[in-house]
Design a protein with these regions (language model features):
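Structured catalytic-domain cores with a bias toward divalent-metal coordination
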Residues: 1-318
Length: 318
């Protein structure tokens, strides 16, 4: 929607030109304290798109939290030229406090959508986000990082079947754009059902700030907001974006100590040796070879690996 009048979110009325914050959800901890999920809304007097910036879907993915924090601290974000910016720095507050990916009951919040008013904790949070936020936005960016010990090179994920999402991803101008099918019960899937494009930004490693991941996330978001006319903030130019139609994981054939000889983000050639697995006693060593020409878009930084562990993520252009 491209609003011209008031917005109603969580029972709060927000007029054009207003900025405010409130809680999307509030729930009680076992120690009786309340845990709130803050939402920040910045509105222009001029009508325009409503854009969601969301971090902390998974509590240990701190790069996304830092990206949203840096964005909302900018004057140009707090005072948009047109439209509305809705920012949720941390969606999974309980997981963030505990430093864990999931909710206290072990559920993945990103598999709880569209949610239920009287369901599990994750289902209730998903229900509030779907009903109060997803229903009014035009598009959004959901900031993530790699899973435990997985370091993702900055990349945007969207379904190439969604022409609008792909167009927006190109405007964001990340190093890589990946064709990513929808996953049932995910936030992005629920948004697609309602024709709301959500770009998933993946960069860095859980529980670790990565300068490149944060910078690329901030700059890409500003490029997109500039393109939409929501802001006018100077952003560094980039050379090009590589579009990847598919990806493949290189997995450990043997257990042992894993080392890689390549930097993430680099191009690799088929059959090139890109890593080794050794036993801890210096007796045996196995080479890891690239399955095809492609780009190294993620590395597992875990030094001790088991058979079948995902080690290196390779992006393929065709």
């Amino acid at each position: 929607m491209s609003e011209t009048t008031t917005l109603e979110i969580c029972g709060k009325t927000i007029h054009p030109g207003e900025s405010t914050h409130f809680n999307l959800t509030s729930y009680r901890l076992p120690i009786s304290d309340m845990l709130d999920t803050p939402v920040y809304v910045f509105r222009s007097l001029k009508p325009g798109p409503i854009v969601l910036l969301q971090g902390g879907m998974h509590g240990n993915e701190t790069n996304g939290v830092e990206i949203v924090r840096q964005l909302v601290s900018r004057h140009g974000i707090k005072n948009p030229l047109k439209g509305t910016i809705i920012a949720i720095p941390i969606l999974n507050i309980a997981g963030f406090i505990a430093g864990t990916r999931d909710l206290p009951d072990g559920r993945d919040l990103n598999r709880c959508f569209p949610g239920s008013k009287n369901g599990s904790l994750g289902s209730r949070i998903a229900y509030s986000l779907t009903r109060e936020i997803l229903s009014i936005i035009d598009l959004g960016i959901d900031f993530h990082t790699g899973g435990e010990k997985i370091n993702n090179y900055p990349q945007l994920r969207c379904s190439f079947e969604d022409a609008k999402a792909l167009e927006l991803a190109k405007v964001f101008h990340p190093p890589f754009i990946l064709n990513s099918p929808y996953r049932e019960k995910s936030f992005r899937r629920e948004a697609a059902k309602n024709t709301k494009p959500i770009l998933v930004y993946e960069a860095g490693e859980s529980l670790r700030f990565t300068k490149l991941a944060v910078e690329q996330g901030v700059h890409g978001t500003l490029r997109l907001l500039n393109h939409l006319g929501v802001c006018s903030i100077q952003v560094p130019k980039v050379d090009h974006t590589i579009i990847l139609s598919s990806t493949s994981w290189i997995r450990a054939r043997k257990a042992g100590l894993f080392r890689t000889t390549k930097k993430y983000g680099s191009f690799i050639e088929k059959d090139e040796i890109i890593g080794t697995i050794s036993d801890p006693y210096g007796e045996k060593e196995y080479d890891l070879k690239a399955p095809a020409d492609g780009f190294l878009i993620a590395i597992n930084n875990k030094p001790v690996v088991n058979e079948g562990d995902a080690l290196i993520h390779v992006g393929l252009e065709k």
